[in-house]
């Protein structure tokens, strides 16, 4: 470990912070909440703030037992801040901030870990920024970090916890590992027992392959640490069980945890290899380097079986254990959703950075991987140049004019321009044998995030959510007393 309170470390984290604010915070409240689930989260949190009942999440008096309360508490806290009607007129900043901040803090933790514990071949400035951007620019992270549900917050709290566990095992100081266990408690308060299961699997996989596993286990202080996790996470479950009894037990533990894992819920049935497919999408456009990073980490693990390898040099092996834990656990699950892969993306980002660091630009593997990657980028560019063939297949009853609006708004043209420029730059940097090609392309993707994603979000909001907000405003103007509004397909709603 490099124990530095150096200007270089602070500068690196400041750069990562600025990038994170651009990706996760910028224009966070410019659009309304989309779909059914995020508004329900927001409504439950707002009800907590207004009623003062911070124990049981409810929407219009109806219990919501699907998730633990941390996401509601954080949303409710932001809803309780003064002058919210000025700085959050749509109420979407308050609803989305927990997800955004969870991803932002995890991004900083990834950068700091890669800076303070450089692995073999790492560049102390390049690797932390590239690794953290690899996480933040994942298509799934970009989407869920701006969505008012609990998945990104789980990824943030669990990811920080797992990195802190490894940092403790890699460190020679006498830290009691309190923070790691505390964040694990927060993760359990975000999504439930699944957080504890994933953390246990990751650490168990890692310890099994370590020769001095007993000393490493003692380092993370499991007896006192587990007590900290229990003190943070368990009291709410006990209080909720005492208040609501059997309905809470059956709904939360029975349906939303056990039944979701053992049987298909809401028609979300997918084949066992589903997350191998999601892994490809989640790591675009650098997916080939993820698989190479996995190969390199596995090779280093096999090498460590023959030669002694210190824990400070084992971050990539630990990341492989982390990714494997998520992959195995959710592949066995009967119910499968793309969001289940989010907790593995921090590990995937670290493995992608491992791939770039381990390759030299004269290496044949490097050449083959980049040629494959350029073909992927070229394919994406061509998809937009021939968009007329697939735009007509878009059939969304809630946005019937979406295809024509994508063209008339200029978004399709911008996508053609951006991805063709991106592909061309990748080819130029490849032939110039640039050492920092990954970082340059990531920065261009960062620009593209604002150039493309922001207009797309605003177009979707204008087409889908703005009409609903206009109707809601009209209803508030003509409503008499506490009349109830009935909407087809939804429960009774008080506006």
Segment roles from a protein language model:
Residues 2-4, 9, 178, 296-492:
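Membrane-embedded architecture of ER/inner-membrane glycosylation machinery
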Residues 1-366, 386-387, 461:
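Membrane-integral, polyisoprenol-dependent glycosyltransferases
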């Amino acid at each position: 470990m490099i124990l530095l309170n150096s200007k270089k470390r602070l500068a690196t984290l400041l750069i990562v912070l600025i990038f994170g604010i651009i990706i996760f915070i910028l224009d966070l409240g410019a659009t309304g909440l989309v779909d059914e689930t995020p508004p329900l989260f927001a409504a439950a949190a707002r009800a907590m703030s207004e009623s003062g009942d911070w124990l049981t999440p409810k929407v219009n008096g109806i219990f919501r037992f699907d998730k633990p309360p941390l996401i509601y508490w954080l949303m409710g806290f932001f809803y309780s801040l003064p002058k919210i009607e000025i700085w959050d007129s749509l109420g979407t900043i308050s609803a989305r901030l927990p997800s955004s901040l969870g991803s932002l803090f995890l991004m900083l933790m990834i950068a700091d870990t890669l800076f303070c514990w450089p692995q073999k071949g790492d560049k102390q400035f390049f690797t932390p920024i590239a690794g953290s951007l690899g996480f933040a620019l994942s298509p799934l992270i970009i989407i869920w970090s701006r969505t008012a549900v609990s998945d990104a917050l789980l990824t943030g709290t669990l990811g920080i916890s797992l990195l802190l566990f490894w940092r403790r095992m890699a460190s020679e100081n006498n830290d009691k590992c309190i923070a790691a266990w505390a964040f694990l408690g927060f993760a359990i308060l975000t999504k439930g027992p699944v957080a504890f299961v994933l953390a246990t699997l990751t650490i168990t996989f890692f310890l099994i392959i370590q020769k001095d596993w007993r000393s490493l286990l003692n380092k993370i202080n499991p007896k006192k640490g587990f007590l900290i996790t229990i003190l943070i996470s368990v009291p709410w479950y006990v209080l909720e069980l005492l208040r609501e009894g059997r309905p809470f037990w059956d709904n939360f533990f029975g349906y939303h945890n056990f039944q979701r894992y053992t049987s298909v819920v809401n028609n979300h049935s997918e084949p066992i290899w589903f997350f191998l497919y999601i892994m490809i999408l989640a790591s675009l456009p650098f997916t080939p380097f993820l698989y190479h990073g996995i190969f390199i980490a596995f090779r280093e693990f096999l090498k460590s079986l023959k030669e002694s390898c210190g824990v400070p040099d084992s971050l990539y092996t630990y990341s492989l254990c982390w990714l494997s834990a998520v992959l195995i656990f959710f592949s066995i699950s009967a119910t499968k959703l793309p969001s289940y892969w989010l907790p593995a993306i921090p590990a995937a980002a670290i493995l992608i950075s491992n791939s770039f660091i381990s390759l030299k630009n004269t290496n044949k593997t490097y050449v083959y991987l980049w040629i494959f990657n350029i073909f992927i980028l070229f394919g994406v560019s061509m998809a937009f140049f021939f968009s007329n063939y697939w735009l007509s297949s878009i059939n969304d009853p809630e946005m019937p004019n979406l295809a024509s609006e994508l063209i008339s708004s200029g978004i399709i043209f911008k996508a053609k321009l951006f991805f063709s420029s991106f592909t061309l730059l990748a080819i130029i940097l490849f032939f110039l044998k640039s050492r920092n090609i990954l970082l340059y392309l990531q920065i261009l993707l960062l620009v593209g995030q604002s150039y493309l994603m922001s207009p797309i979000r605003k177009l979707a909001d204008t087409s889908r959510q703005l009409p609903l907000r206009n109707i809601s405003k009209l209803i508030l103007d003509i409503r008499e007393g506490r009349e109830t509004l009935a909407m087809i397909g939804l429960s009774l709603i008080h506006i």
